[in-house]
């Protein structure tokens, strides 16, 4: 009986042990899972606790220093992402930049061991003290950058890199437009603090261009920064100036402005290649003059209205317009000479005959004109011959003499007209070569030195690019 009773009791004891072991296993698994989920939650709680402790008595309007005479040193740097536009008319330079600023905030320090090993936090810039560094030479009323988050380290180092879109004033020198080189500057400094309270330290002399997006019209030759101080009767104010030396890419203006202007100036030369009796000579000159006026108006819309300097292309257009005006005057004079005759003008002077009928044609490679004036003419009447005994013969001779004199007179008139026409041709040929020479020399003299100087500007390798 005792043996039979001990068997069921042992079985029940074994089942009880397995049930307890299973429950303990489930409880352990649940506890492990709960411990695994509690770790991120504890990090968030640590960061919440850190922020509450840091900003419980924090006042963002108060300069974060321990003593009144302590100064905050701001490490300042500039990175450019895009040169958006250079407005020559309004003398503005539009840029997208990043303002790199770093300083020590003694009120934002903590021990990472007390907050779960947290060493870096990110808070909005509106929640902490930030230096009021602005762009002094801004032209659109926006002096500050965009509000972004700051990166704060456990030792109190605050890093703030806000992006900004600036329209800064820039004095544009259009003397060598479109082969010009501009120097635009951006001046940064504190708006209210003097140097004894906030000092600016230049982080890097060169502007960071690692993320720069190329512009289709302008190329940055150099972008460097320098520190300066402005003093008045009581205080000194530090500032940082970044100078951007930019070079224009003139391909667009060369194709659509300079080459058409040069072509129009050479069209003026072709006016003198037309025959002197063609009235289209004046029409061609007038059309060229109107076209140059249109180009001058186009340039006036691009460049600023200034009386200090005259742009190179403007000088060339004015030179060409004077050139065309002179060609119109010369053409009118040549047409007038072409239509002269003995009945409208006096006899041609011997010096004019010698120069324009003999000397100049040889120099201009023209076919020599027949010398009708320096050839000795035979006397038509050598004296009184023997009297004819017949009256009919004398009458016939008188008639022949009359006809001969009339024909010779007509020939002389025709020769005078042809001589004037030939002089007009000589003038056209002379001014053709003269204007062609002046056009070539003037174009080369104006553009070649400037283009050579522009082409030899070296683009230095930027430090930021070298460190990529």
Swiss-Prot record:
Q: What SUPFAM superfamilies does the record point to?
A: Neurotransmitter-gated ion-channel transmembrane pore (SSF90112), Nicotinic receptor ligand binding domain-like (SSF63712)
Q: Which reaction does it catalyse?
A: Ca(2+)(in) = Ca(2+)(out); K(+)(in) = K(+)(out); Na(+)(in) = Na(+)(out)
Q: Which GO terms describe its biological process?
A: acetylcholine receptor signaling pathway; behavioral response to nicotine; chemical synaptic transmission; membrane depolarization; monoatomic ion transmembrane transport; neuromuscular synaptic transmission; presynaptic modulation of chemical synaptic transmission; response to nicotine
* CDD domains in alphabetical order: LGIC_ECD_nAChR_A5, LGIC_TM_nAChR
* Outcome of swapping residue 398 to N: Risk factor for lung cancer; decreased calcium permeability and fast desensitization in (CHRNA4:CHRNB2)2:CHRNA5 but not in (CHRNA3:CHRNB4)2:CHRNA5 or (CHRNA3:CHRNB24)2:CHRNA5 AChR; no effect on activation by nicotine
Tell where it localizes.
Answer: Synaptic cell membrane; Cell membrane
Positions annotated as glycosylated = 155, 183, 229
Alphabetically, the GO molecular function entries are: acetylcholine receptor activity; acetylcholine-gated monoatomic cation-selective channel activity; ligand-gated monoatomic ion channel activity
* Segments in the Extracellular topological domain: 23-254, 452-468
Tell me the Gene3D superfamilies matching this sequence: Neurotransmitter-gated ion-channel ligand-binding domain, Neurotransmitter-gated ion-channel transmembrane domain
List the cysteine pairs that form cystine. Answer: 170-184, 234-235
Which segments cross the bilayer? 255-275, 282-302, 317-337, 430-451
The residues forming the signal peptide are: 1-22
Activity-regulation annotation: Activated by a myriad of ligands such as acetylcholine, cytisine, nicotine, choline and epibatidine.
Which keywords label this protein? Cell membrane, Disulfide bond, Glycoprotein, Ion channel, Ion transport, Ligand-gated ion channel, Membrane, Receptor, Signal, Synapse, Transmembrane, Transmembrane helix, Transport
Q: Which InterPro entries match?
A: Neur_chan_lig-bd, Neur_chan_lig-bd_sf, Neur_channel, Neuro-gated_channel_TM_sf, Neuro_actylchol_rec, Neurotrans-gated_channel_TM, Neurotransmitter_ion_chnl_CS, Nicotinic_acetylcholine_rcpt
Give ranges for the Cytoplasmic compartment.
338-429
Q: Which Gene Ontology cellular component terms are annotated?
A: acetylcholine-gated channel complex; cation channel complex; cholinergic synapse; dopaminergic synapse; neuron projection; neurotransmitter receptor complex; plasma membrane; postsynaptic membrane
Subunit record text: Neuronal AChR that forms heteropentamers composed of two different type of subunits: alpha and non-alpha (beta). CHRNA5/alpha-5 subunit is only able to form functional nAChRs when co-assembled with another alpha subunit, can be combined to CHRNA4/alpha-4 or CHRNA3/alpha-3 and CHRNB4/beta-4 or CHRNB2/beta-2 to give rise to functional receptors. Interacts with LYPD6.
Report the protein's function: Component of neuronal acetylcholine receptors (nAChRs) that function as pentameric, ligand-gated cation channels with high calcium permeability among other activities. nAChRs are excitatory neurotrasnmitter receptors formed by a collection of nAChR subunits known to mediate synaptic transmission in the nervous system and the neuromuscular junction. Each nAchR subunit confers differential attributes to channel properties, including activation, deactivation and desensitization kinetics, pH sensitivity, cation permeability, and binding to allosteric modulators.
Q: Which family does it belong to?
A: Belongs to the ligand-gated ion channel (TC 1.A.9) family. Acetylcholine receptor (TC 1.A.9.1) subfamily. Alpha-5/CHRNA5 sub-subfamily.
Q: Mind telling me what this protein is named?
A: Neuronal acetylcholine receptor subunit alpha-5
Source species: Homo sapiens (Human)
């Amino acid at each position: 009986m005792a043996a039979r009773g001990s068997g069921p009791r042992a079985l029940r004891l074994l089942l009880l042990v397995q049930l307890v072991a299973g429950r303990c296993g489930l409880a352990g698994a649940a506890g492990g899972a709960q411990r695994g989920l509690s770790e991120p939650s504890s990090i968030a709680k640590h960061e919440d606790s850190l922020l509450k402790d840091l900003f419980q008595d924090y006042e963002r309007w108060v300069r974060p220093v321990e003593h009144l005479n302590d100064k905050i040193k701001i490490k300042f740097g500039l990175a450019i992402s895009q040169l958006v536009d250079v407005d020559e008319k309004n003398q503005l330079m539009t840029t997208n930049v990043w303002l790199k600023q770093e300083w020590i905030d003694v009120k934002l320090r903590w021990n990472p061991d007390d907050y779960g090993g947290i060493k870096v936090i990110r808070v909005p810039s509106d929640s902490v003290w930030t230096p009021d560094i602005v762009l002094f030479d801004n032209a659109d009323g926006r002096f500050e950058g965009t509000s972004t988050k700051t990166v704060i380290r456990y030792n109190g180092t605050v890093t703030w890199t806000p992006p900004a879109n600036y329209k800064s004033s820039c004095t544009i020198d259009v003397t060598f437009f479109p082969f010009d080189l501009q120097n635009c500057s951006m001046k940064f400094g504190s708006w209210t603090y003097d140097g004894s309270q906030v000092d600016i330290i230049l982080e890097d002399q060169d502007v960071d261009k690692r993320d720069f997006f190329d512009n289709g019209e302008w190329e940055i030759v150099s972008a460097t920064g320098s520190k300066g101080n402005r003093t008045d009767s009581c205080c000194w104010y530090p500032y940082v100036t970044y100078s951007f030396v930019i070079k224009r890419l003139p391909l667009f203006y060369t194709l659509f402005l300079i080459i058409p202007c040069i072509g129009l100036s050479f069209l003026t030369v072709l006016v003198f290649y037309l025959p002197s009796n063609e009235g289209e000579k004046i029409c061609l000159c007038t059309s060229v003059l109107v076209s140059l006026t249109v180009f001058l108006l186009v340039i006036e819309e691009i460049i600023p209205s200034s009386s200090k300097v005259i742009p190179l292309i403007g000088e060339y257009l004015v030179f060409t317009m004077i050139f065309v005006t002179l060609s119109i005057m010369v053409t009118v004079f040549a047409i007038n000479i072409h239509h002269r005759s003995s009945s409208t003008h006096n006899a041609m002077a011997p010096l004019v005959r010698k120069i324009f009928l003999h000397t100049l044609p040889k120099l201009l490679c023209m076919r020599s004109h027949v010398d009708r004036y320096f050839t000795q003419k035979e006397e038509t009447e050598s004296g009184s011959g023997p009297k004819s005994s017949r009256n009919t013969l004398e009458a016939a001779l008188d008639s022949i003499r009359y006809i001969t004199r009339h024909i010779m007179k007509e020939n002389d008139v025709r020769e005078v007209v042809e001589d004037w026409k030939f002089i007009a041709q000589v003038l056209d040929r002379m001014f053709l070569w003269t204007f062609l020479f002046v056009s070539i020399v003037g174009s080369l003299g104006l553009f070649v030195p400037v283009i050579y100087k522009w082409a030899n500007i070296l683009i230095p390798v930027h430090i930021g690019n070298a460190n990529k």
